[in-house]
Amino acid sequence: MGCTVSAEDKAAAERSKMIDKNLREDGEKAAREVKLLLLGAGESGKSTIVKQMKIIHEDGYSEEECRQYRAVVYSNTIQSIMAIVKAMGNLQIDFADPSRADDARQLFALSCTAEEQGVLPDDLSGVIRRLWADHGVQACFGRSREYQLNDSAAYYLNDLERIAQSDYIPTQQDVLRTRVKTTGIVETHFTFKDLHFKMFDVGGQRSERKKWIHCFEGVTAIIFCVALSAYDLVLAEDEEMNRMHESMKLFDSICNNKWFTDTSIILFLNKKDLFEEKITHSPLTICFPEYTGANKYDEAASYIQSKFEDLNKRKDTKEIYTHFTCATDTKNVQFVFDAVTDVIIKNNLKDCGLF
């Protein structure tokens, strides 16, 4: 008699087993859900990383989606040449060919309607082409650190002939290079290595930062983007503030924030291609007067890396995972994101006591 298990006990044991199973499944599901927060100052490349996730993990942009970016490409191209021509007045640079002054007047007369309609008419593309070929305009472009200019300016202006075709459809690379200021929070979902990612891209300009706070809860990792090439630039919203210094200030507040004690911090030192180009003729001492190294990519990039990593006040318990990136290079982003995912998996296993 003593060995007999009552029907009630059996049912209770089954219920207990089922609860354990559900808890285990919920735990496994939670461990497979990854919430990534993309942070960084304005124009550091966050939105480009999000676009790359669509290209790498979601079959990219369809022809119809690319077509919808045509007006943005036109607008970015028009805004870029206008910014350069406006800066010529401030920097007192003349056109090499005086007749380009007429083209400049035409540019400002035609651009407003073209942008409103999302088009690039032949007369306007001709004006832009002639202006971009002028040596005075090129001299002003060479001094672009002295005013605000899109990173994609030369990319679009050098390819104007293709962009101005009547049957133009933007390529994936054209879409990656588009610049639209992020306002609010953009959420992207994708699956990779059996993990379900939710990625949040947050506006980087100062006015956008107050919107970050409610995204903080339950974040698995933060990807903090820094534009390496911004070391000699000032902010669009505060022309007294060096962009790199602003980025460091922001990284300090994120890295040492009590909200993020247990959050993996991944540092993307981005725009390495632009930095490599720029460092040979624009010294790092503009940003860091104490720098005594060579104005060469490896040495200067390592110095910036150490400046950011040194801001971490919890080095004994918190590791910063740093990667040098070029957000417009799909292969590079794919390689880096693969490494980032491995770190997330490893840290998830640690949290579950399995590593």
From Swiss-Prot:
SUPFAM superfamilies for this protein: P-loop containing nucleoside triphosphate hydrolases, Transducin (alpha subunit), insertion domain
Region: G4 motif, residue numbers: 266-273
Post-translational modification (record): (Microbial infection) Deamidated at Gln-205 by Photorhabdus asymbiotica toxin PAU_02230, blocking GTP hydrolysis of heterotrimeric GNAQ or GNA11 and G-alphai (GNAI1, GNAI2 or GNAI3) proteins, thereby activating RhoA.
Membrane topology: Lipid-anchor
Lipid attachment locations (S-palmitoyl cysteine): 3
This protein's record includes keyword Cell membrane: yes
Subcellular location: Cytoplasm; Cytoplasm, Cytoskeleton, Microtubule organizing center, Centrosome; Cell membrane; Membrane
Residues that coordinate or bind GTP: 40-47, 176-182, 201-205, 270-273, 327
Sequence similarity: Belongs to the G-alpha family. G(i/o/t/z) subfamily.
Subunit and interaction comment: G proteins are composed of 3 units; alpha, beta and gamma. The alpha chain contains the guanine nucleotide binding site. In this context, interacts with GNB2. Interacts with GPSM1. Interacts with RGS12 and RGS14. Interacts with UNC5B. Interacts (inactive GDP-bound form) with NUCB1 (via GBA motif); the interaction leads to activation of GNAI3. Interacts (inactive GDP-bound form) with CCDC88C/DAPLE (via GBA motif). Interacts (inactive GDP-bound form) with CCDC8A/GIV (via GBA motif). Interacts with CXCR1 and CXCR2.
Protein name: Guanine nucleotide-binding protein G(i) subunit alpha-2
Organism: Homo sapiens (Human)
